[in-house]
Amino acid sequence: MQFSDNGVRFDVTLRGTITFTDDLTDVQSLSDGGSLTMRDWSRVIPRTVEIKSAAGKLTRAYFVGGLSRPWDEEAQRFLATQLPMLVRRSGLGAESRVQTIFEKKGVTGVLEEIDLLGGDYARRLYFVALVDRARFDSNGVKPVLARIGERMTSDYDRRQVLQHIASRVTLDESGAAAYIQAMATMTSDYDQRQALETLMQSGASVDGNAIAGAVDHIKSSYDRRIVLNQAIGRGSLTVESKRSLLAGAAGMKSDYDRGQVLTSYVQRYGVEPPVREPFFAAVKAIKSDYERRRVLTEVAKKDGGNREIQQAAFDTVSQMSSDYDRAEILLAFVSAQGIDSASRPAFVSAAERLKSSYDQNRVLAALVRAERR
């Protein structure tokens, strides 16, 4: 392992399992056959400490410029001076450090130690070890989630810790909200999507509004689609959650991804009266006539006989430009459950707007045949 910080440059090699003294001035134990090598390149002449374990005993060696020096006060002072920075920067011995601190000071003590760490890699190791050691419930893990959101800046390391929590702790709605809040400053669409997927797959009680709020931070239409489709597939969404998710779909940039989300939504829930307005607003946000047709054809299959849905669909069709796609949508509604008498004027108006005589004739002919049945 190599790292540098404020002019300090170190090479560190660890073999085996290591524990340090509580004050981080020395190595307390090292698994048999293990070794720790620290080489400081910060000065013109490098200094090296080698600690080895054999037959239950530790041996220490000190080198300056490659030449062996006695293990004296200078050597011990060098180790004691550099070890705190080394341990807190690299995360060496994280599991044993967390165990020792947790046994003496509890969760608060470990969180205080995490505040002293010098990087997100080390923080990740400590957070993961704490979660494994403490065996939190949903309420108990909230301070940890808050500290993750406050202290971690690396999206990758933060996501790794959050996923570990989701896999170890059964989160209730409040805990899931704290989890999502811990993601608030993440910028990587991939890491946000992965963290949300793991949360939903874990069986946590996730509020749909919270998911929709998190989705608003995701710029990638692909990543947003994956999250929204997973949220839709979970079922048991409140009306308000459905409205929020549909608003999230409307804000997507890709017509393909938006169409995929709306199609999944229709297949799962249909178009219920309380969400009709946000649903069709999302459909109208689709610029591609082909993608609109895909969604509205699915609507026709699911709720094609509903008068209000027919009228909203025909209004949307009238704003499209492709005669073929418009005709196919109108035919899908005719084939589904027929056209409601109250919706017939809107249907005929949409058909008459077709510039293609061929498409107009086949749509109106289908209407006449359906009415004769």
Residue ranges and their predicted role:
Residues 1-373:
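Non-catalytic all-alpha helical scaffold/repeat segments
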